[in-house]
Amino acid sequence: MRFGWLEVAALTAASVANAQVFDNSHGNNQELAFSPPFYPSPWADGQGEWADAHRRAVEIVSQMTLAEKVNLTTGTGWEMDRCVGQTGSVPRLGINWGLCGQDSPLGIRFSDLNSAFPAGTNVAATWDKTLAYLRGKAMGEEFNDKGVDILLGPAAGPLGKYPDGGRIWEGFSPDPALTGVLFAETIKGIQDAGVIATAKHYILNEQEHFRQVGEAQGYGYNITETISSNVDDKTMHELYLWPFADAVRAGVGAVMCSYNQINNSYGCQNSQTLNKLLKAELGFQGFVMSDWSAHHSGVGAALAGLDMSMPGDISFDDGLSFWGTNLTVSVLNGTVPAWRVDDMAVRIMTAYYKVGRDRLRIPPNFSSWTRDEYGWEHSAVSEGAWTKVNDFVNVQRSHSQIIREIGAASTVLLKNTGALPLTGKEVKVGVLGEDAGSNPWGANGCPDRGCDNGTLAMAWGSGTANFPYLVTPEQAIQREVISNGGNVFAVTDNGALSQMADVASQSSVSLVFVNADSGEGFISVDGNEGDRKNLTLWKNGEAVIDTVVSHCNNTIVVIHSVGPVLIDRWYDNPNVTAIIWAGLPGQESGNSLVDVLYGRVNPSAKTPFTWGKTRESYGAPLLTEPNNGNGAPQDDFNEGVFIDYRHFDKRNETPIYEFGHGLSYTTFGYSHLRVQALNSSSSAYVPTSGETKPAPTYGEIGSAADYLYPEGLKRITKFIYPWLNSTDLEDSSDDPNYGWQDSEYIPEGARDGSPQPLLKAGGAPGGNPTLYQDLVRVSATITNTGNVAGYEVPQLYVSLGGPNEPRVVLRKFDRIFLAPGEQKVWTTTLNRRDLANWDVEAQDWVITKYPKKVHVGSSSRKLPLRAPLPRVY
């Protein structure tokens, strides 16, 4: 296997150890170009709710050989087993097949007889913790029933720095608090169903352009390294790390490191983000897995905190691996300490036991690589047994109900001048626009949904699933209108503008459907290389709206999109009587929409992002051209914490629709704000102190002779194994640079297993436990002042004070039901983290002495209640 594994590892480690500052001469923030080293990689200790699972993990790992431990850490290769990623097995100890990891955050990818759930952005639009949990639980049940151990989701990266970022729809919202809560609830739901959840993509994975070298070169960009997202420490903590802290506190079992570099160190070998922030500061007890082919070194990644390499090979189907045999070699020759591989295995097995995989596990009953019933056991090389690979297990249960409910609960009513709800008495209804109809190639006609044909209910990429069916808006509206005795006329060709004009001129109400799509960078649709080229509507959408509006004075516009689109040309046209954003609602799309259109569901959704007048309104453009020669493109996050509504507030720019905005068929009033300091004597902040125990080791390493390929083993071509060809470690590694001195490439302290000092901001999963002590109670009275029952989403924002802070930041929210005339007192609390800022010098959270205020209302700019916060330190 001649591919310079140790050479790559050595160079990578040396660059970190020597604190090399990469060229970033174009930027204003030179200090952002460097990621400080942090070693050694913290070892798991089973804190809190992890204790029992950790104990069981230690027990089984103590019985494993080195090769068995390595087998758990390394995927067997792309298309080598049933799942998109699958580790080796440990049959001697009852792990008879490798751990199965499978996409995606909205349903099972590459499968059948599964559900297609609403996207993460729709969950954010509900602002509903219970619905987030129930969706996670339903997805977890389906993955479990298919034999999946690790669900590769949910996502909080990208967070949403760029409104045109290709994968923002997979996550939740550009607000860290909204994302963090729904991220955590989704994780709880998945893991309560017995499946390991994966918090991804960690971290600063905010655009698709330049995320992978080969992909970028395929689009004609001459780069040799992936993009570097360069951020300061305060912004990292207060914005991008925030939801991952919530995920760790919720007990997430796995974290997926990202393709991009962070401050010029690759995400899956960045000791600052993996060792320090995730494992030492946030106290993460689970395992870190690489994104697929985001693993760039052997020793460097192992020492920097990576625990699992996926899918195991360096490039898809090349049969080469940074780990596998090479990880075995590196432990035997002392390059990687035994305790580090022990910790990898313990972390993996701890997550396994924590969610109950030992009780629930069944073999994968589907193949990711074919829909045929029979196929090769090892698809990539057509080897192994020709066997039954698909059992066609229907795992949908009754999940269509929660999908339909979330679809309706996430339908944002942006504008309504009395057009909605429809009465059902409309005689002639026009349904206009391609986005209302079916994909002529079928709902799953485009691989990984990589096209924009028909209605948009899911965007594209690995974050997708096959639809079991797709109820289009046209189908659902037609069924509704016919049942009411009316007439419905549909034109779903966006080029048929004259026909649309004819229908619109005859209709009592015209429903216009438009969309905007995006996705993962390995697919380009109409020149959109994952990221959107702009924020305009797709498929001639503006012309469709203009045509219909000019012929019908009761036009309702429905937008299916991955994020914000530009609507400034037409949103205030008086003939546009209502605007709906329906996002990416999944398989029940049409039914969910009709429930809202006809008033069976009173809309309560709130937009999870800001609707600006222009792309420039959002700040810095997405990086679409290399800016560092053929080196790593440099994306400096110079805006700091000021993204989305925080950016608009800083610029004092009025958006078209602000973050948190959403109308209802009723009205709500806010009154009687009360703010009360809680007993602070028992809640003083206590920085964590002390040190860890020494790094534990489990079992004996043995010698090279113990890890030769087993006699009689029929090797599968390109399959990644942990064993050695020879007792000569240099020969087994087959690396021309074998034998380098450790001092040339091992970072200082990287192999130190002695007790290590605890970080002040650490101490428990999620960070210092006293960060989560409640300091202030806030209550307000919410009244339904209208004539229709409905849900309202009260939102609490805090002004943290200080000259360089956002005007307000969201901290708490809820979704409460109120009958007409009903009042409820909504009560919530603010904890220390809610009121603190990250102090870069102190490396800890600090409540500053600047005066602070609390604001309560229905959106980020409709905050009728406000009061000063009591001083709490």
From Swiss-Prot:
A Gene Ontology molecular function term for this protein is: beta-glucosidase activity
Sugar-bearing residues?
N71, N222, N263, N326, N333, N365, N453, N534, N553, N575, N679, N725
PROSITE patterns with a match to the protein in the record: GLYCOSYL_HYDROL_F3
| Record's keyword annotation contains Kinase | no
**Signal peptide extent:** 1-19
GO biological process, alphabetically ordered: cellulose catabolic process; glucan catabolic process
Record keyword Secreted present:
yes
Q: What pathway does the annotation place this protein in? A: Glycan metabolism; cellulose degradation
Q: Which catalytic reaction applies to this protein?
A: Hydrolysis of terminal, non-reducing beta-D-glucosyl residues with release of beta-D-glucose
Q: Write out the catalytic residues in the record.
A: D291
Cellular component (GO) terms are: extracellular region
The record's listing under InterPro entries reads:
Cellulose_deg_GH3, Fn3-like, Glyco_hydro_3_AS, Glyco_hydro_3_C, Glyco_hydro_3_C_sf, Glyco_hydro_3_N, Glyco_hydro_3_N_sf, Glycoside_hydrolase_SF
Under Pfam families, the record lists: Fn3-like, Glyco_hydro_3, Glyco_hydro_3_C
Q: Write the Enzyme Commission number(s) for this entry.
A: 3.2.1.21
Name where it's found: Secreted
Entry similarity comment: Belongs to the glycosyl hydrolase 3 family.
Protein's name according to its UniProt entry? Probable beta-glucosidase A
Source species of the chain: Aspergillus fumigatus (strain ATCC MYA-4609 / CBS 101355 / FGSC A1100 / Af293)
The encoding gene is: bglA
